[in-house]
């Protein structure tokens, strides 16, 4: 009897032996269920890194930074395993918070939340943090924005985080290996299309109330990320979770068609998610469904891992590092030039980090920083309001 065409490759049980994480991932790719998908995602990502003229875009959602994943993303930026990051504002806030000396704490989801509130402790499932310390970061961002961003001027979120990253690297005693700091140092753009939905957005709103409105232009964000796709022959996408960042990247292909530009769909697609497709939401939407929209190429390798990203990312990142470090430094990744009216992109091996990182001093106590930043912002606002009142009085007198 002839062997069925469906029975060409047997599964291989994993043997417990001494092996690298990359070898474990390869072995998982020959098993079943989500273990196989995890192994396949490593293989597909590694294949992306071997391609010429390919831009790798990551969507980063969920409370990954407070859950301890921020250094993984920073490492991927530093080694150009990703070339563009689209994130929630909360993940960037928590990254900045830790980069400037704040800490998250091992907690429990069984805690008495009323008692936590009375003690000034915020809970993110089983992670704790001090609310007053968060306020210190709020005031730092607000104070920086009021002193360094032009009132009434529109900035893309990419411009905002590039400037904030420069401040963190060059002016604060901050960790140079955070996400925002690494993105600035290695010229990797960060887009946060829903920045208002975060503590950073709250800080900018308070600055507005103090008479210093800073406008984050969402349409400029859409234009800028579309320019990246326009200037790239092929793109690969990786999604940690889904949400706004996922569709913000996905829709670039739809925009290309509306601009009457060639549309091919993203050439590679990977997602790590706990959402299911049958509820109809975007976070669980399959890549096969995205093909119908022209967002993903029909022939693209597509891997969706239905698993907690706090489990997937540590395994995948270590496996990738072991599997690709021999050629990753030579990878010709996109180098961005935003100096003109239109983005220019060239593909070449990345140069050394552009920013010199100052020697780190001991982190400033968070509560002291909070009070100081609050006073600084209040003084700046008072001085500005006094000047405005004086100008108004002069105008009235004349």
Spell out what each predicted region is.
Residues 42-55, 183-184, 227-234:
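Glycine-rich phosphate/diphosphate-binding loops that line cofactor/substrate pockets in enzymes
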Residues 56-65, 85, 191-195, 213-282:
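Glycine-rich anion-binding loop/nest that anchors nucleotide
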Residues 2-9, 36, 234, 258-360, ...:
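C-terminal functional extensions of proteins
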Residues 73-139:
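A generic, well-ordered mixed alpha/beta core segment in the N-terminal half of proteins
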Residues 1-42, 46-48:
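N-terminal glycine-rich anion-binding loop in soluble enzyme alpha/beta folds
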Residues 68-71, 96-102, 201-206, 249-252, ...:
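Short acidic, glycine/serine/threonine-rich loops at helix termini
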Residues 368-396:
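Long, intrinsically disordered low-complexity tandem-repeat segments
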Residues 115-200:
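Ligand-binding beta-strand-loop-alpha-helix segment within the catalytic cores
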